[in-house]
Structure formats: structure tokens, C-alpha cells
């Protein structure tokens, strides 16, 4: 029997599975458009860009950013066009030298065995991909042919370097590593050390670590300045805590990242009722680090809308000790349980700490009352009758 530590108390009941597939996908009320999707994609469409030529100043990045069908099309067409272009050059050299005229075999040709455009095209492929010459080869008769041979080899090497490098960068892009960095589907707000905290869980499915991992969080909401200026996407950085202080994390096992809602937090006036009808609140979480195996910087992103924040719940433990090592149960990665939490804003809690004292007293009496009621209702396993004593 495996020894386990950190078993969930029996009085707690699992209330929500964060990855519950049965949750309805469509809602009756209209939701605010996300700035960042749950998978980390930025929901921004760029329109009316006048200076399109700026993209051509960085051709390599433009090719890497293209979709795979477009990249493969450019990859194929670049080689085909270069072969056809130099095939035309070889055909013109043979035509100018008179190598295409039938019945004249006394002159030494510039390139042997070129009698048509098809043979010139085959010779162009043989030169550029260096698969070796067959019956066609360059002679010493035409210095121009030797120069074209050198130019085509250099151009072929440049095309290989650019296109193969582009394909390699697309297959080794950093966002591929981010597919195994996961966030909890829901965030929670509950008490920790007597303060309301915004919490989420983050984990890494791979054994290879993320070096120098840091996590940041921003609140994006629509605001209006005192001068009447409407800012549709006002971004505010808020500090995150991971139990040891600072933004750096050691992501060897899933961690609960939390933000203390204090007077400097944009969530200071957030109430439980605001989570059901708040349309302008979006919390963006960014995890960034260096991939241990490749050394490439990767970034994983997600966001939480107001209705994706659970008030008065916390994440269940998923790390247990088994046979001298720690085991992580990812099936409970998004599970939460209800815990006593004041139904007020952090500002109201700071102004009236008696709410916290009353909550602490009620929670301490709760388990005792449950046990006393259970003992009172329990039936004895056996009874002793007076006749048996006589």
C-alpha cells in the first residue's frame, strides 16, 4: 500500500472540475471580446497598414511568421524559379554559341549534350543541387559558362540557407514548448494569511525544465480618464507571489501563484457580485522562461474573464509523497473546493476586520458542530440489557 500525505479532508466536497467538458460553451448574455485567448493567442486584427514595405525589410522574420501552406509554397517556388531562370541562361549560352544547330559536331560546345530547353533545365538542376554530372558538363570553350556555373552555385547555397533556416525556425518555434505549459481553467479568490488573494495554478507537463521562469500578470479593462478620454485597453501590472517572493518560480511541480489584493491592487474594490456581470475585466497571465534543451526563450499566456473567477474556493492539493518521491496527480489540476470566505471587497475587509474574526470563529466551530451532531445521531453497535446483568 502506497503511503500518501496531504489527503483531502472528508468534510470538503469537490465543487468544480476546471477542465469539465460538460460546461456549456454558449452563454445567453453577450461576453466581452478577449484580448488574449485561453490558449494564449492575441485577439487583435491589424487593418489599414499603409507601409507594407516594412515587412520586406525583414524577409526572414516575415517568412517565419507566414502560415505553413504559404511557407511551403514559397519554398517550392524559390527552387523552381531559380532552376528555370538558370536553365534559360544555359539555353541562351548554347544558342549564342551555336550548340543547338543540328549537324554541326566539329565545334566544342560550351556545355555538352544540351540540345533543347529540357536538357538545359536538367543541367540547371544538376548544377544547383550538386547531384553530379551525367553526359552534360561545362567545357573550357566558354569563360562565360564557367562564370555562370559559379554564380548558380552561390545562388543555390543562399536559397538553401534561407529556406532551410526558415523551415527549421518554424519547426523549433518557442510557442511549441508552451503547449505543455498549462494553466488552470478558472482562477479563485479566497483568503490566505488573512488577506483576500487572487490565485491560479500553473504547471509543466514535461520533465525538461524551464530555466529562469518568471510570471507576470496584468489587468486589462476599459477606463475613462478624468479628462473624458476613453481607454479601451488600459493595462495595469500587478505583482504576483509564489510563496518565496518575487516573480521568479521553480516550476518542477505545479505551483499556485497568487496576488494579494491590497490597497494598490486594481482588484481592491472587486466584489463577488461583480464576477457575474463585470464585462470589462480581463486578467492576463504571462509565463516566460528559457527552454532547458534548446536554450530558446518561450512564453505561455492565458487570460481570465470575470465569470471565470470563482469566489470563496481554493485549489485542492495534487502533490503527494509516494515511495520516497513526490507524485503529481494532474487529473485534479483544476479541482477546487469551497472554503469560508467573506462576501465583501478587500477594501471593506480592511476597513472592518471584525468580518474576518467572525468568519474565523464560524469556521472553527463548524467541524466541531458536525462531529457533535454525528455523535448524537450515531447508533450504538451493541446494548446491555438489565437481564444480562442478573
Swiss-Prot record:
<dbReference type="GO" id="GO:0033574">
    <property type="term" value="P:response to testosterone"/>
</dbReference>
<dbReference type="GO" id="GO:0031669">
    <property type="term" value="P:cellular response to nutrient levels"/>
</dbReference>
<feature type="topological domain" description="Extracellular">
    <location>
        <begin position="134"/>
        <end position="142"/>
    </location>
</feature>
<feature type="modified residue" description="Phosphoserine; by MAPK1">
    <location>
        <position position="385"/>
    </location>
</feature>
<feature type="topological domain" description="Cytoplasmic">
    <location>
        <begin position="1"/>
        <end position="65"/>
    </location>
</feature>
<dbReference type="GO" id="GO:0005886">
    <property type="term" value="C:plasma membrane"/>
</dbReference>
<comment type="similarity">
    <text>Belongs to the inward rectifier-type potassium channel (TC 1.A.2.1) family. KCNJ11 subfamily.</text>
</comment>
<keyword id="KW-0406">Ion transport</keyword>
<dbReference type="GO" id="GO:0014704">
    <property type="term" value="C:intercalated disc"/>
</dbReference>
<dbReference type="GO" id="GO:0070852">
    <property type="term" value="C:cell body fiber"/>
</dbReference>
<keyword id="KW-0597">Phosphoprotein</keyword>
<dbReference type="GO" id="GO:0030955">
    <property type="term" value="F:potassium ion binding"/>
</dbReference>
<feature type="topological domain" description="Extracellular">
    <location>
        <begin position="93"/>
        <end position="116"/>
    </location>
</feature>
<dbReference type="InterPro" id="IPR016449">
    <property type="entry name" value="K_chnl_inward-rec_Kir"/>
</dbReference>
<feature type="intramembrane region" description="Discontinuously helical; Pore-forming">
    <location>
        <begin position="117"/>
        <end position="133"/>
    </location>
</feature>
<dbReference type="GO" id="GO:0071356">
    <property type="term" value="P:cellular response to tumor necrosis factor"/>
</dbReference>
<feature type="topological domain" description="Cytoplasmic">
    <location>
        <begin position="172"/>
        <end position="390"/>
    </location>
</feature>
<dbReference type="GO" id="GO:0071333">
    <property type="term" value="P:cellular response to glucose stimulus"/>
</dbReference>
<keyword id="KW-0813">Transport</keyword>
<feature type="site" description="Role in the control of polyamine-mediated channel gating and in the blocking by intracellular magnesium">
    <location>
        <position position="160"/>
    </location>
</feature>
<dbReference type="GO" id="GO:0015272">
    <property type="term" value="F:ATP-activated inward rectifier potassium channel activity"/>
</dbReference>
<dbReference type="GO" id="GO:1903078">
    <property type="term" value="P:positive regulation of protein localization to plasma membrane"/>
</dbReference>
<dbReference type="InterPro" id="IPR041647">
    <property type="entry name" value="IRK_C"/>
</dbReference>
<dbReference type="GO" id="GO:0002931">
    <property type="term" value="P:response to ischemia"/>
</dbReference>
<dbReference type="GO" id="GO:0043025">
    <property type="term" value="C:neuronal cell body"/>
</dbReference>
<keyword id="KW-0633">Potassium transport</keyword>
<feature type="transmembrane region" description="Helical; Name=M2">
    <location>
        <begin position="143"/>
        <end position="171"/>
    </location>
</feature>
<feature type="binding site">
    <location>
        <position position="176"/>
    </location>
    <ligand>
        <name>a 1,2-diacyl-sn-glycero-3-phospho-(1D-myo-inositol-4,5-bisphosphate)</name>
    </ligand>
</feature>
<dbReference type="GO" id="GO:0009410">
    <property type="term" value="P:response to xenobiotic stimulus"/>
</dbReference>
<dbReference type="GO" id="GO:0001508">
    <property type="term" value="P:action potential"/>
</dbReference>
<dbReference type="GO" id="GO:0001666">
    <property type="term" value="P:response to hypoxia"/>
</dbReference>
<feature type="binding site">
    <location>
        <position position="50"/>
    </location>
    <ligand>
        <name>ATP</name>
    </ligand>
</feature>
<dbReference type="GO" id="GO:0061762">
    <property type="term" value="P:CAMKK-AMPK signaling cascade"/>
</dbReference>
<dbReference type="GO" id="GO:0005768">
    <property type="term" value="C:endosome"/>
</dbReference>
<dbReference type="GO" id="GO:0005524">
    <property type="term" value="F:ATP binding"/>
</dbReference>
<keyword id="KW-0630">Potassium</keyword>
<keyword id="KW-0547">Nucleotide-binding</keyword>
<feature type="transmembrane region" description="Helical; Name=M1">
    <location>
        <begin position="66"/>
        <end position="92"/>
    </location>
</feature>
<feature type="disulfide bond">
    <location>
        <begin position="110"/>
        <end position="142"/>
    </location>
</feature>
<dbReference type="GO" id="GO:0031072">
    <property type="term" value="F:heat shock protein binding"/>
</dbReference>
<dbReference type="GO" id="GO:0005242">
    <property type="term" value="F:inward rectifier potassium channel activity"/>
</dbReference>
<dbReference type="GO" id="GO:0005635">
    <property type="term" value="C:nuclear envelope"/>
</dbReference>
